[in-house]
UniProtKB/Swiss-Prot annotation:
Molecular function GO labels: structural constituent of cell wall
Gene name of the record: SPI1
Name this polypeptide is given: Uncharacterized cell wall protein SPI1
Biological process terms in GO annotation: fungal-type cell wall organization; response to acidic pH
Glycosylation sites: N41, N59
Residue ranges the record assigns to the propeptide: 128-148
């Protein structure tokens, strides 16, 4: 029973220290500001400053158009419209699927390919003082949690 209480206290303290905000669909963790102090046994180390150089990402989209000559094609019209294909005018008054056989017809198929790249390597901060971030941020409650 006591170990369950310790676990619940630890979870409550951890979520309080980091500012865990949650609802049924998502969670957000708010990290303490850079003014926070991380406390160890007998020392206090200022929290590391966030990196001022965020990685730069570039998105690239290449668009190409492919053409295909077909003997017939099927299209869906979800609402009333009028269009012309091979000199014939088609009028649609309600949602319907049409098969056009007045061909040969050239179908245009736009395609695109997206790529993402970064100009920076991802680095992690491995400061030994971070191991005690939660108890330090909680003060006395954190010290009590460490004793349990």
């Amino acid at each position: 029973m006591l170990s369950n209480a310790k676990l619940l206290l630890s979870l409550a303290m951890a979520s309080t220290a980091l500012g865990l905000v949650s609802n049924s669909s998502s969670s957000v963790i708010v990290v303490p500001s850079s003014d926070a102090t991380i406390a160890g046994n007998d020392t206090a180390t200022p929290a590391p400053e966030p990196s001022s150089a965020a990685p730069i990402f570039y998105n690239s989209t290449a668009t190409a158009t492919q053409y295909e000559v077909v003997s017939e094609f099927t299209t869906y019209c979800p609402e009333p419209t009028t269009f012309v294909t091979n000199g014939a005018t088609f009028t649609v008054t309600a949602p319907t699927t049409l098969t056009i056989t007045n061909c040969p017809c050239t179908i245009e198929k736009p395609t695109s390919e997206t790529s993402v790249s970064s100009t920076h390597d991802v680095e992690t901060n491995s400061n030994a003082a971070n191991a005690r971030a939660i108890p330090g941020a909680l003060g006395l409650a954190g010290a009590v949690m460490m004793l349990l």
